[in-house]
Amino acid sequence: MKQYLELVNEILKDGEKREDRTNTGTISKFGVQKRYDLREGFPLLTTKKVFYKAIFHEMLWFIKGDTNIKYLVENNVKIWNEWPYENFKKSSEFNNETLQEFVERLKNDNEFCNKWGDLGPVYGKQWRDFGGIDQFAKLINDIKKNPFSRRHIVSAWNPAEVDNMLLPPCHSFWQVYVSKDGWLDLQLYQRSGDVFLGVPFNIASYALLMELIAKECNLKARYFVHTIGDAHIYLNHLEQINEQLKRKPLPLCKIKINSEKSIFDIAFEDIEIEGYESHAKITGEVAV
């Protein structure tokens, strides 16, 4: 995906070095935008291998309105583990358990998981219950009834509850646009984007969301417009980022939704990726 590599080069060229909340340090650029045409293929990064199963599970978890990571850890999705673990470490119950021991206890102890596996009122809660409003169901209904409305909006940023979230929403606000000839576009505003670890996930995640909404509403997915406020590369990811820049993007894969079920009932097994080829995996530490 050349757009992603263009974003990386823009940040390295024009960004500024900044201190950050995690004390890792970043190179940051404010206000960037990239456009991905889903008609050309599913925008799953090819310059490093991406664990797309985690992306699919997470999106279904959002749609269900879930905020406890039990479903994720049971499906070997590790992307949220560090935040509840760091929260647990601050408690009087912490007894020097490792992260892996913490995760295993979440899997096997429901009472412990109910207490320590919840992230607070994060994405799923806001999508499905923003002050009593099911934004997601309303969006689907409104697209079907009034497709050309300019009010097809879902917000995960709730100022009344943001301080109760273990991590305030990075991808915080999105809007859907329906063209007169049956195409569905989506623009995401992301307040903060970890370009090495997070942004490749976010691109594929919202592309999947587009495909799911389009199928539900009898439309076709077209443009994903990704707007990022603080787009940053952590300083401890520079070696990995430069390795990616040496790699040539490969052809994009395809995605299929093999079900006629409602978007609210779609399961992981209903989603299929065809022809995904990538360069080797590149790892990096998450900044918490």
From Swiss-Prot:
Pfam families: Thymidylat_synt. It catalyses: dUMP + (6R)-5,10-methylene-5,6,7,8-tetrahydrofolate = 7,8-dihydrofolate + dTMP. One of its GO terms (cellular component) is cytosol. It is found in: Cytoplasm. InterPro entries: Thymidate_synth/dCMP_Mease, Thymidate_synth/dCMP_Mease_dom, Thymidate_synth/dCMP_Mease_sf, Thymidylate_synthase. The keyword Magnesium does not apply. It comes from the Bacteria. Pathway: Pyrimidine metabolism; dTTP biosynthesis. The keyword Ubl conjugation does not apply. SUPFAM superfamilies: Thymidylate synthase/dCMP hydroxymethylase. (6R)-5,10-methylene-5,6,7,8-tetrahydrofolate binds at residues 194, 287. HAMAP family: Thymidy_synth_bact (MF_00008). Belongs to the thymidylate synthase family. Bacterial-type ThyA subfamily. NCBIfam families: PRK01827.1-2, PRK01827.1-3, thym_sym. Catalyzes the reductive methylation of 2'-deoxyuridine-5'-monophosphate (dUMP) to 2'-deoxythymidine-5'-monophosphate (dTMP) while utilizing 5,10-methylenetetrahydrofolate (mTHF) as the methyl donor and reductant in the reaction, yielding dihydrofolate (DHF) as a by-product. This enzymatic reaction provides an intracellular de novo source of dTMP, an essential precursor for DNA biosynthesis. Homodimer. This is Thymidylate synthase. It comes from Mesoplasma florum (strain ATCC 33453 / NBRC 100688 / NCTC 11704 / L1) (Acholeplasma florum). The gene is thyA.
